[in-house]
Amino acid sequence: MMKNLILFLLFSGSVIAQQSEVVYENIIITPLKSSENLLIQGVKKHNEKYHSTGETTASLYSVLVGKHSGKYIWLNGPMKMADYDDMPDTAHMEDWQKNIRNHATDESVKIAKLNWDASYSPPSWGSPKYLLWRTFKIKQDNDSYQKVLETITKIGKVLSAINAPHPRRVYESVFRSEDREDITLVYPFKTFTRFSESNGLPEGFQVEYDRINGPGAFRKDVGDVLSLHTNGWHDEVLMLIE
């Protein structure tokens, strides 16, 4: 039930008022392989005790594909930045140590804020088992970040205009990372057949983009901007741990 709730909150715009502040805490956990199952069970115990009620809930994903494959991502939200002023108490942290850190070799934390304007959220989609995370490697100059965000926002507007079948949420890192991988697109999906033809934008999207924005607009607004202002992107596939 808790897992279904967090997924529903992630992708349903009807629960959270549009334009309200929505933040998710992502902790990437490297498991101690000799006690990996104990880590999974420990996360479940910790989540049930501390993160199963209220507006903010937590869930665990296994990274199947990508640079963090073999690791886990603990996802906590939706939150507001003000929530970080109320840090976990000693008992809470001792439970995290006992059930999670004792079975892990490393943790890294990222705080991501939902960009409503750039996202595309159909009214109802359901709770997916899998997530595709697409993270851009933005160049380290003064204007590349904003240029890339503008492009992603334009794509979101066209997805909305054509009533695209799949949601796409856009999350920005609250705190700048060293490698500038600070914009991530999140695509939920239910089956890997989703990638039989394409692993991103809907089939025929470029044609629709040019129809709405003018001939050659997709190449200028998307292709040229991403070529000039990023060093590409990388994908990761996450699976919900039941």
Give the location of each predicted region.
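N-terminal leader/presequence-like segments
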Residues: 3-5, 45-46
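Sec-dependent N-terminal signal peptides
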Residues: 4-14
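Short S/T/G/P-rich N-terminal loop/turn motif that feeds into the first structured element of a domain
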Residues: 17-242
